[in-house]
Amino acid sequence: MCSPSETKTSVIDQLKRAASAEEFFTTLGVDYDPQVVNVARLHILKRMGQYLASEDLAGLSNCAVTERCKAVLERAYADFVASSPLDQRVFKVLKDAVSPKRGAFVPLDALK
């Protein structure tokens, strides 16, 4: 639950001012493994942004927004605890860099 001091400044404003991924975790009260964050900090925050984009936060209290943001950060973080940034392919450069292997193509007219 939110305390009165947490409701004075919008959590979105606090996150906009955050200078590091660790500040996101601290602001939202999410526990994390520093090793996971060191490897995937940008990926986690990008995924959090993707998840937040699908949330409707309009008209919610700051406490409700904080809880939603916390849940979204936990979900994004869990994605990278369970797998690597390369597996998740959040950024276009990773999506394009290593394409999944395709089966060999043999045209029918090559078979005789």
UniProtKB/Swiss-Prot annotation:
Q: For this entry, list what GO says about its biological process.
A: nitrogen fixation
Quote the InterPro entries the UniProt record gives.
NifW
One Pfam family this sequence matches: NifW
What keywords were assigned to this record?
Nitrogen fixation
Q: Which family does it belong to?
A: Belongs to the NifW family.
State how it assembles: Homotrimer; associates with NifD.
Function summary: May protect the nitrogenase Fe-Mo protein from oxidative damage.
- NCBIfam families (alphabetical): PRK00810.1
Protein name, per record: Nitrogenase-stabilizing/protective protein NifW
**Organism listed in the record:** Rhodopseudomonas palustris (strain BisA53)
Could you read off the lineage of the organism from its UniProt record? Bacteria, Pseudomonadati, Pseudomonadota, Alphaproteobacteria, Hyphomicrobiales
Gene that specifies this protein: nifW
